[in-house]
Amino acid sequence: MANNKSAQKRIQVNERNRLQNRFYKSSVRTLIKVFLKNLEIYKTSKSPEGKEKLQKILSSVYSLIDKGTKKNVFHKNAAARKKAKLASSLKIS
């Protein structure tokens, strides 16, 4: 356990930030899985509603990745890499 106030505060701040980072990373992973699952469904049906749904999911993934980057959860290059991978997977289909 920490002996002085500043060390105790750092422990509290680090724990708070760890939980926030975990939330962002988990949410991004979950949304990416949802996007990829819907992408597979779209590849089989090719419906315009499916394409619209994919665009909506993709924009929400982008938004969450950008918010995480702004809060230093993701490095900017890692965020760009994730977004490019998703965009290329949509473009291929």
UniProtKB/Swiss-Prot annotation:
Gene designation: rps20
Compartments where located: Plastid, Chloroplast
Listed GO biological process terms: translation
Swiss-Prot/TrEMBL keywords: Chloroplast, Plastid, Ribonucleoprotein, Ribosomal protein, RNA-binding, rRNA-binding
UniProt key word Ribosomal protein: yes
The protein's name in its UniProt record: Small ribosomal subunit protein bS20c
Organism field: Phaeodactylum tricornutum (strain CCAP 1055/1)
Functional description taken from the UniProt entry: Binds directly to 16S ribosomal RNA.
NCBIfam families: S20 (TIGR00029)
Family designation: Belongs to the bacterial ribosomal protein bS20 family.
GO MF assignments: small ribosomal subunit rRNA binding; structural constituent of ribosome
Pfam families the UniProt entry points to: Ribosomal_S20p
